Each structure stands twice: as C-alpha cells, then as structure tokens.
C-alpha cells in the first residue's frame, strides 16, 4: 500500500537549506519516492496553516519510506534541513481497493 510523506516547512536559512536540496533528489530517487506536490504558498481553505511551503511525497510502501528516512544517505543530509527550517511532517497511509 502506498504511503504519503507530508511536510509543512518554514525555511529560516536559505543557504543551509540549499545544502539539503542539492542532495535530496539523488537520495530520494534511490528509494522510489515520487513528488506529488510542492507548493510555496498553498491556499488555506479552512483553519490555520503554520508554514508556507508544502510538500507531498509518495512511496510505494511504508517499508520503502522507512528505508529512505532511516538510510545513512538521508541521515547525512537531513541535518541541513533540520538546521535550516521549522518542519511539521506526517506519514499517511494510502487506500487499497478493499477500503472502497
């Protein structure tokens, strides 16, 4: 079952965040991640939205997500994102045909 990594991001240090961006795609593709949406200013329909940047990434399975997020390659660059930005992230499980 697919799963979706969703992040709200507020970048405080562009130079440090660039160090993350320069390498993240290379690591990301290795683990079968697929960008579904990246928006610098999503439209708020209801409630409050804390940060401007929104990212949705699909993985084929929760296992693939964990392999990516816990990989030494990702851990090596994650530090740059954590230093450069405030982030709220969640992992959402996708639906299967049985869910309908």
What are these regions (language model features)?
Residues 66, 73-90:
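C-terminal structural segments of small proteins and small subunits
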Residues 1-54, 59-70, 74, 93-100:
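Short S/T/G/P-rich N-terminal loop/turn motif that feeds into the first structured element of a domain
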């Amino acid at each position: 079952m697919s799963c979706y990594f969703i992040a709200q991001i507020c970048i405080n240090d562009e130079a440090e965040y660039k160090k993350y961006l320069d390498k993240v795609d290379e690591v990301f593709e290795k683990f079968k991640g697929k960008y579904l949406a990246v928006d610098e200013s999503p439209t708020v329909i209801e409630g409050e939205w804390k940060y401007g940047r929104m990212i949705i990434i699909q993985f084929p399975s929760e296992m693939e997500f964990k392999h990516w997020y816990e990989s030494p390659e990702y851990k090596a660059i994650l530090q740059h994102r954590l230093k450069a930005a405030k982030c709220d992230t969640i992992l959402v499980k996708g639906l299967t045909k049985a869910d309908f």
